[in-house]
Regions:
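Alpha-helical interface subdomain recognition
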Residues: 1-80, 86, 98-103, 110-115, ...
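Short Ser/Thr-interspersed hydrophobic loop/turn segments at strand-loop and sheet-helix junctions
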Residues: 46, 70-74, 167, 184-189, ...
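Flexible, glycine-rich active-site loops centered on histidine and acidic residues
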Residues: 92-98
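Short Gly/Pro-enriched turn/cap motifs at secondary-structure boundaries
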Residues: 111, 126-129, 153-156, 172-173, ...
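A short, Trp-centered hydrophobic/proline-enriched beta-strand micro-motif
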Residues: 114-122, 166
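Flexible, small-/acidic-enriched active-site or ligand-binding loops
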Residues: 133, 187-216
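A short core secondary-structure module
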Residues: 144, 148-193
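Long, acidic (Asp/Glu-rich), low-complexity accessory segments flanking structured domains
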Residues: 213-232
Length: 382
């Protein structure tokens, strides 16, 4: 749902200009850091508050509006989007969707301005796709919970001011019902951050382990004030995030296809541009068709969610198709570039590595398939 087309177009124009003029992906790839002036520019644009309601200082974008902005951000290194996207997405959505009023008032305004960043602490060394099997524990001790455990591959962990933490509070319930969601502030004694992970791609987007050792978290920090709701909160957060990541994949694919098209027009072999060869045209056409299909899926799912409809099947469909599509487009782009596509100077190999993560985080492609199929079976058996 687009509330005001003129306002949205002005925002999109600003974001596209920011991406085009200031977000140099080769710099962040070489330094593994996002410059402070770029972070300041993101704050000025309101990117840290995209999805946070206006009453808390954010822009309060609808899902459709958010998807369009994220597609624009997908035109450059995903590391830039990761810095604010984790905060406006999985980092804050648990508080926004299920938090108590005072929790929203305390944290959302600071997140909206970028004063603090938020991370989503769900994944563990032994609990990745099987998120319900997490082992991090939170034992009640008076007015506190004592948290022990390790979270792995946590995006923005080195920079986060708060963590949306999922921990097991009911040790008798080994399933999702034993999981509770907490807001844990970074300066809470007992929290330590591991060294930054050395990754295949997305340099500048930092992930690390978060270790909790007898970390005493006030009982008031339980999201929504009720135990046992953490897994439900996590799934709601991830459902929205799947549309977000699908939109990101569409944007990245559009950028790679544009680069491949321009290269194929300029590059000459056998006395003519390689764009005139039908086998190259087939790769270009297949990529365009798949991008169009993925974008249509994302926009449809976003509108459905804005209308208050159930998108528990559509969201994973978007994530599955769009991220797999993006991988195929990346591969074709490298192929069109030929040997140049394998050399760092041209940049397409960097995108090839960067987008590989899209099929892994916030639910692997295989998890999306399982969720889709289960929903289909459940619907058929009603």
């Amino acid at each position: 749902m687009i509330r005001d087309r003129d306002t949205l177009n002005a925002l999109l124009d600003s974001v596209e200009r920011f991406v085009r003029e200031r977000l140099a992906e080769h710099v962040v790839a070489e330094t593994d850091e996002i410059p402070e002036d770029i972070v300041a520019g993101m704050k000025e644009l309101g990117l840290f508050g995209l999805t946070i309601p206006e009453e808390y200082g954010g822009l309060g974008l609808t899902m459709e509006e958010e998807a369009l902005v994220i597609m624009a951000m997908g035109q450059t290194s995903p590391a830039f989007r990761s810095l604010f996207g984790t905060t406006v997405g999985i980092g804050s959505q648990g508080i926004l969707l299920d938090g108590l009023d005072w929790q929203k008032r305390k944290y959302l305004p600071k997140l909206a301005t970028g004063e603090i960043l938020a991370s989503f602490a769900l994944t563990e060394p032994e609990a990745g796709s099987d998120a319900a099997s997490l082992r991090t524990t939170a034992a009640r001790d008076g007015d506190f919970y004592v948290v022990n455990g390790t979270k792995r591959f946590i995006t923005n962990a080195p920079h986060a001011g708060i963590f949306t933490l999922m921990a097991r509070t009911n040790h008798e319930d080994k399933g999702p019902g034993g999981v509770t969601a907490f807001i844990v502030e970074r300066n809470t004694p007992g929290i330590s951050i591991g060294s930054r992970d050395k990754k295949m791609g997305q340099k500048g987007a930092h992930t690390a382990d978060v270790i909790f050792e007898n970390c005493r978290v006030p009982a008031s920090q339980v999201i929504g004030g009720k135990e046992g709701q953490g897994f439900k909160t996590a799934m709601k957060v991830l459902e929205k995030g799947r549309i977000h990541i699908a939109a990101l994949a569409v944007g990245a694919a559009e950028r790679m296809l544009r680069d491949a098209l321009n290269y194929s027009i300029d590059r000459k072999q056998f006395g003519q541009p390689i764009a005139e060869f039908q086998l190259v045209q087939a790769m270009l056409a297949d990529s365009q068709a798949e991008i169009y299909a993925a974008k249509s899926m994302v926009m449809d799912a976003a509108r459905r969610r804005d209308d208050g409809r159930d998108v528990s099947t559509e969201a994973p469909c978007c994530k599955l198709f769009a991220t797999e599509m993006c991988g195929r487009v990346a591969d074709r782009a490298v192929q069109i570039f030929g040997g140049a596509g394998y050399v760092a100077e041209y940049g397409i190999e960097r995108f090839y590595r960067d987008v590989r993560l899209f099929r892994l985080y916030e639910g692997t492609s295989q998890i999306q398939q399982i969720v889709i199929a289960r929903n289909m079976i459940k619907q058929a058996c009603r």
